[in-house]
């Protein structure tokens, strides 16, 4: 039986020998206000290679403005609910509708276009559903993807949400639970108290020390086998 890691390395080498461009993807997955965007921007400035930042917000804010208003959004975009659970904390949850699902699928296809043209991408994400995760696994088949978990403490996440002023209470809490529910990571970072430039350096060092990421392979075995 062929070792999947060796087979994957061979594909990368054959692509390089053929002169084919090979874009790489770093996927930062975590809840709202976990610090993913700040981390991505700091990483861009630190890295010697060019990394394009294509975050989820770029596509989220491309939706019609009315559909970003929780009081007016139509169910074909998404529905949402908020509840105080047994822990006494408020949890906010988004349930994507078909239009939001299609927008996120299109986002993954757009990122894939960059990779296929030899451009590296760092993308911050909130993987709200298992379906989004499975879609990413399919779209990025054959690509080198570093899956990075980005975490923040509940207290600090709530403080950041309040400071932003445009988030429903419990948004960070609920989105973090959804994002990490099915995920596996090549490495993880906690943004609670560490300065972003230090986290960017840690991310860059971890990326360099891990030339053949395996988290996506493990996830494919779980969900696509």
Swiss-Prot record:
Listed Gene3D superfamilies: P-loop containing nucleotide triphosphate hydrolases
Annotated keywords: ATP-binding, Nucleotide-binding, Transferase
EC number in record: 2.7.1.-
InterPro entries given in the database record: CPT (IPR012853), P-loop_NTPase (IPR027417)
Entry annotated with the keyword Chaperone: no
Superkingdom of the source species: Bacteria
MF GO annotations: ATP binding; transferase activity
CDD domains recorded: CPT
A Pfam family that the UniProt record links to this protein: CPT
Organism annotation: Mycobacterium bovis (strain ATCC BAA-935 / AF2122/97)
Binding site for ATP: 30-37
Name this polypeptide is given: Putative O-phosphotransferase Mb2669
Family membership: To S.violaceus chloramphenicol 3-O phosphotransferase.
